[in-house]
Amino acid sequence: MLQKLKCNKNGDFTVLVVADPQCEKEFQWKEAADELEILLKKEEPDFVLINGDMETNNLITKENWGIFIQPIIERKIFWSTVNGNHDPFKKEINDMYLEFDKCLNTIIENERPLNYCIPVLGSKEEKTVFAIYGMDSGDAFIDDGWTGYTKKQLEWYRNCSEELKTENNGVSVTSMMCCHIPLQEVVSMEILHGVCNENMGRTSKALNVGTFEAIKEQGDVKILVFGHSHKINVIGKLDGILMGYAGKISSGSYHDEFSRGGRIVKFNENEPNKVVTYWSGVLPTSKDQPAVVI
């Protein structure tokens, strides 16, 4: 477990998820910072998660990363990262992230190291009321999709979920889960809002270890948020669980003018079984989406 966050005096906690800056040039890092600034001013999140694919060749410099996250640092907001297919785990890069203030990345002993659970405390007591899972979803393409979660990762998630449940007197702790590569099940969800201007890259069906079924069984994760697809910002629902895309931040790599922005997830401790999500754009052509409640 990591340092714990806290709901505000009204019981609210807001998460901003952005993804895929995939910057290669300094002007793109500055552009990503400008778009992040827009989102932070607009949404005032308590926590920011950057959901993979920071730089195409996984060669991020401390200088460029500092440009990108300066708006977060200035506001003293806690933040973390998730590995994407373009940035498989490198200890030296994770160590660089940790040199910046308020970074909550950690390493779990696992086949792929960067998985973590960040608890969020209630406003008035030392009790976990919400949790944020960050998961490594693999970097290799196999036949019909990406490698996705491993069995060891799934076992870790189950154990962590059960630990939180035990601490909460046998009641599951409402949670969100972020990973870069979408689960295979996105093709089956009912799309509620958003644009989808490319094929939905996802976990290989052959390598699917049953992540979605495990999440249904645990009953704690209400929403999964993905990256990877730069021209998709949809939100959908399957079997009572929301699955949404973060869209893209910056013009790094391929992009369009409709999915530039980030996904917001809101929780309130006074309604502990509910989450609210919507997508927030940074360009005039990237239209905000209506809120979805589950």
Model regions: which residues?
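Soluble or luminal CAZymes and related metallo-dependent hydrolases
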Residues: Q28-A32, I60, N64, N110, ...
